[in-house]
């Protein structure tokens, strides 16, 4: 391997690592706030890329009807809860509007806009809106009533949600794969390296999102409420913070980050209905570096996963997935040795 080849592999690895970093941050966020090991994170990646692909073809994506169906079911559950708690009609109406209005509006706009074949950025915004709104609804229907259950129970629910979303993905998108057009098709030469415009977009989007998350958590009331819920759910509840609202918000952010990741990698690789699982698992491996608690460690782990995957594909392409996922073993052993005595004392 010469220096130019190593540089190309390193650039490719860092590019993939930037995407895995977004998924790792989403995984850490969801686990910190809700204690859910969110296996279906990768499905949001596939849904984002494939929803955009169908919009590119001028078709209404099936995720729109999934959004409407989940919103309707959530509204029925809200009505049942309101009746059981004896809420006034005005309170019930406000709750129904919060649940139904935005999904219905996004669905209507998408149904109208899909045949029009608007520019790529408009279609991308629609795809982001559709998939992002799925996140809070998934939490409301699958996890909210089990918020105080054990981590194992929540993990089992995550496995079920993963299989459900994967099966629905096959129904909505079919078995064929799609590759989306790049957001920027420019080319830049930096010595022996050829830098594509899409790579620049990936770095810029990942950096902007990380900075945005930092500002959100440090400067906004909702962000501080999420941090408080992550530190101590009971204490946050005693201070008047709604843990269910925090859970919905964390799932919404995770869905947004997953959908954005799908839009970013859609032009660089062919995405199938089940591609999100492996992509999400690589984000999970990166999150393990931070013990599902540290955002900086998860981001660094994502870069390591991306670089290792890139060099593995060069030296042993048939075993690159095995090599990447084997990385989790020494990390788990290290964390076990580091914290084992503390766990025994507890």
Summary of predicted features, one role per range:
Residues 6-57, 75-85, 137-153, 289-295:
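Single transmembrane alpha-helix segments in multi-pass membrane proteins
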Residues 62-156, 161, 300-305, 336:
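Alpha-helical transmembrane segments within multi-pass membrane transporters and channels
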Residues 42-47, 94-104, 127-128, 146-170, ...:
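Pore- or pathway-lining transmembrane helices of multi-pass membrane proteins that form conduits
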């Amino acid at each position: 391997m010469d220096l130019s080849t190593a540089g190309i592999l390193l650039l490719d690895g860092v590019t993939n690592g930037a995407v895995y970093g977004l998924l790792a941050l989403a995984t850490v966020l969801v686990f910190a706030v809700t204690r859910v090991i969110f296996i279906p994170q990768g499905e949001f990646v596939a849904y984002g890329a494939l929803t955009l692909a169908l919009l590119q073809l001028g078709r209404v994506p099936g995720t729109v009807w999934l959004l409407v169906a989940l919103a309707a079911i959530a509204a029925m559950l809200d009505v049942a809860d309101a009746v059981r708690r004896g809420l006034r009609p005005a309170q019930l109406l406000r709750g129904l509007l919060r649940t139904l209005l935005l999904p219905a509006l996004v669905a209507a706009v998408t149904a109208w806009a899909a045949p029009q074949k608007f520019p790529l950025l408009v279609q991308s915004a629609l795809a982001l809106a559709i998939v992002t709104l799925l996140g809070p609804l998934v939490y409301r229907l699958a996890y909210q009533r089990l918020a105080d259950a054990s981590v194992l129970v929540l993990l089992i629910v995550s496995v079920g949600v993963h299989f459900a979303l994967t099966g629905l993905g096959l129904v909505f998108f079919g078995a064929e794969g799609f590759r989306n057009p790049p957001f920027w098709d420019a080319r830049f030469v930096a010595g022996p390296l050829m830098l594509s415009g899409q790579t620049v977009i990936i770095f810029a989007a990942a950096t902007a999102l990380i900075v945005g998350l930092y500002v959100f958590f440090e400067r906004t009331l909702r962000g501080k409420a999420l941090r408080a819920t992550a530190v101590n759910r009971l204490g946050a509840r005693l201070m008047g913070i709604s843990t269910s609202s925090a859970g919905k918000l964390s799932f919404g952010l995770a869905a947004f980050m997953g959908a954005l990741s799908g839009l970013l990698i859609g032009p660089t690789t062919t995405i199938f209905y089940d591609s999100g699982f492996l992509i999400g698992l690589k984000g999970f491996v990166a999150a393990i570096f931070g013990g599902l608690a540290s955002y900086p460690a998860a981001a660094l782990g994502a870069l390591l996963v991306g670089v290792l995957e890139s060099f593995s594909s060069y030296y042993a392409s048939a075993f690159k997935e095995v090599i990447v996922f084997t990385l989790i073993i020494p990390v788990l052993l290290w964390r076990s040795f580091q914290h084992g005595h503390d766990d025994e004392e507890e």
